[in-house]
Amino acid sequence: MPLDVALKRKYYEEVRPELIRRFGYQNVWEVPRLEKVVINQGLGEAKEDARILEKAAQELALITGQKPAVTRAKKSISNFKLRKGMPIGLRVTLRRDRMWIFLEKLLNVALPRIRDFRGLNPNSFDGRGNYNLGLREQLIFPEITYDMVDALRGMDIAVVTTAETDEEARALLELLGFPFRK
């Protein structure tokens, strides 16, 4: 039995009908929907100390509810003292209910906890209907307490939609409650 996530229900009951009305889709499968959310954490300092990677993976797993995959260096770069295959980051891909739960938490709890938050940058769409945002610290999530944190680590969040254009994607995310800057 799938979970009843409020944001998911909002999409099916309010957002989808509004998008059909606004853009005049002929078929419900044409309506843009969320495909996945990819969270990436670059940890350059992890090449010196493996414990940093473990701690960051623990925190990311708490935030997302899913074990992160370790990303490794594609090639060696001597200026960065980097060898091919060294662990340099973490990545989590959320789909279905986990994605909806994470987004609900991001929109309702995490973003409002950011100091001096004035809204998300409306220009961070990639031209293909996907939205990217960066967070400076992991403390804004309720699962992470101040005592657990050894260092502030940011993360990149990519919201992948089936929208063909940025205009459609922006309408979808705005209706879902993403707080864009005016």
UniProtKB/Swiss-Prot annotation:
SUPFAM superfamilies registered for this protein in UniProt: RL5-like
A single GO molecular function term of this UniProt record: structural constituent of ribosome
Pfam families: Ribosomal_L5 (PF00281), Ribosomal_L5_C (PF00673)
Source species, domain of life: Bacteria
Any one GO biological process: translation
A single GO cellular-component term on record: ribonucleoprotein complex
Keywords noted in UniProt: Ribonucleoprotein, Ribosomal protein, RNA-binding, rRNA-binding, tRNA-binding
Primary role: This is one of the proteins that bind and probably mediate the attachment of the 5S RNA into the large ribosomal subunit, where it forms part of the central protuberance. In the 70S ribosome it contacts protein S13 of the 30S subunit (forming bridge B1b) connecting the head of the 30S subunit to the top of the 50S subunit. The bridge itself contacts the P site tRNA and is implicated in movement during ribosome translocation.
Quaternary structure (record): Part of the 50S ribosomal subunit; part of the 5S rRNA/uL5/uL18/bL25 (TL7) subcomplex; has also been isolated as a complex with 5S rRNA, bL25 (TL7) and DNA binding protein II. Forms a bridge to the 30S subunit in the 70S ribosome, contacting protein uS13; this bridge is straddled by the 5S rRNA. Contacts the P site tRNA.
UniProt-listed HAMAP family: Ribosomal_uL5_B
Family: Belongs to the universal ribosomal protein uL5 family.
Protein name: Large ribosomal subunit protein uL5
Organism: Thermus thermophilus (strain ATCC 27634 / DSM 579 / HB8)
Gene encoding the protein: rplE
